[in-house]
A protein has these predicted regions:
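Active-site bordering "gate/hinge" segments
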Residues: 1-258, 389, 395, 405-407
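Short solvent-exposed loop/turn micro-motifs enriched in small/polar/acidic residues
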Residues: 11, 199-201, 270-272, 307, ...
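Long, well-ordered mid-to-C-terminal structural blocks that present hydrophobic/aromatic surfaces
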Residues: 250-306
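Active-site lining segments that contact anionic ligands and/or coordinate catalytic metals
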Residues: 256-258, 274-276, 283, 309-313, ...
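Dual-mode signal for accessory low-complexity, basic/Gly-rich regions
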Residues: 286-357
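Extended hydrophobic packing segments that form well-structured cores
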Residues: 362-407
């Protein structure tokens, strides 16, 4: 891949993704196999005005080894230096860039119970720091092709060709062409126009139906609004948290989901794939879940904490989105969630609540924004998915028909 194109992508992440402000610190989290591109992103952040760029390196093989060899108690421990680092982030609010390149099957064979216990133990310590940063800093998730991931997506290609093809797909879906920044300005404007229309309807519930058996009704929070593309921090900094993105999303009301929904794509979770699954909801809670593969892992996900069995997001993405048109199954939620409509179990987004900077976290939880240590998207969009809005004034308005926008 030409370095000029990769530099344009790095600039997009720095200037459109996190939109680094002059004098701001940046923290990049990436796998060890991406030093060249991480350097490009760091350089782009400095050019955008960053004061300091720090890189946190990860290595999936070491993560797997630690889960296998360390005790649950050790895995749960948050050391004093980690707490100090979290407090430093609370105090300085750096931009956070997450570059994904992991192998979708990289944690296959490790105990989901042990992983869940470790995460639960750490979360109780980390949550107060996370809550203090909620809505106050820019962050962006983007992707870089790791070799194992590329071979999973393109199994019949050589390793080098698979990586090249995955690069091409990532850059295409992220609109990295002649003028990517202008392209993203136009894309954000289109998503905002769709959100404005949806917000004008006064939606009380969304009803999902598809021929695969999906029939689910989800309640909306009256104070909530659809968001899409870029968003603002409480301090007014505009950023794009996901590159790419094709969604208009909202946080539904906790406790108001009834029916059953069937997945339309595999879910990559903790380095393993959950395939062909369904979840049934009663009074908002997931009460039954089945899967062809990794059913136990799905059930562990749902049981992670009190909020993990409830919905935190409803996202509308047309089945003919540019990502779905590639015909590629990415085995990565960042891309597959933007191929079609999806829901998310777990944490809701406080910034979908109107006037959220002037509300407390407790007030937003009381309105019905779900809280959880997890936020896991799963894809439900199909070519015949119909979504109908039942509005507070009694109107019934088609939102999706035949898998795509009805307006």
């Amino acid at each position: 891949m030409k370095k000029t194109v990769l530099r344009a992508y790095a600039r997009l992440i720095a200037e459109v993704g996190v939109r680094v402000q002059k004098g701001q610190d940046v923290v990049i989290e990436a796998e060890l196999d991406q030093p060249e591109f991480v350097t490009m992103v760091a350089d782009a952040c400095y050019h955008a005005g960053a004061r300091k760029v720090t890189v946190t390196w990860k290595h999936q093989a070491l993560e797997k080894l630690a889960i296998r060899r360390e005790s649950v108690r050790t895995l749960q421990t948050v050391a004093d230096w980690e707490r100090a680092k979290l407090q430093h982030y609370v105090d300085t609010l750096p931009c956070r860039i997450y570059l994904l390149s992991e192998d979708p099957d990289g944690l296959r064979g490790v105990s989901p119970t042990k992983m869940a216990s470790a995460r639960q133990g750490r979360y109780s310590v980390i949550k107060p720091y996370r809550d203090q940063m909620e809505g106050r800093y820019q962050w962006c998730i983007a992707a870089v092709p790791g070799a194992a991931w590329a071979k999973k997506v393109f199994p019949h290609e050589t390793k080098s060709r698979a990586v090249e093809k995955l690069w091409e797909a990532i850059l295409h879906t992220c609109r990295v062409h002649d003028d990517p920044i202008a392209a993203w300005d136009a894309h954000n404007a289109d998503l905002q126009a769709r959100c404005d229309y949806l917000n004008s309807l006064g939606i009380e519930t969304l009803e999902y139906r598809a021929s695969n058996g999906t029939h689910l009704t989800v309640g909306m929070i009256p104070e909530a609004q659809f968001c899409g593309g870029g968003e603002y921090t409480i301090g007014g900094s505009y950023f794009n948290p996901n590159l790419p993105t094709e969604e208009c999303f909202i946080s539904p009301k906790r406790g108001e989901a009834e029916g059953i929904v069937y997945s339309s794509k595999p879910l990559s979770y903790q380095g393993q794939l959950i395939e062909d699954f369904s979840i049934r909801f009663e009074h908002g809670r997931a009460v039954e879940a089945h899967a062809r593969t990794n059913e136990a892992l799905l059930q562990k996900l749902i049981a992670m904490d009190e909020g993990s069995a409830y919905l935190g997001e409803c996202a509308l993405v047309p089945y003919d989105s540019p990502i779905n048109q590639t015909g590629i199954l990415f085995y990565n939620t960042l891309f597959d969630e933007n191929a079609c409509c999806h829901l998310a179990l777990g944490m809701g987004f406080i910034d979908t609540i109107r006037d959220y900077p002037n509300r407390t976290l407790e007030e937003m939880r009381a309105l019905g924004v779900n809280d959880s240590m997890i936020h896991e998207d799963f894809m439900i969009g199909t070519p015949d998915l119909a979504i109908t809005a039942h509005c507070r004034d009694g109107r019934t308005v088609p939102v999706f028909r035949d898998g795509t926008w009805a307006f």
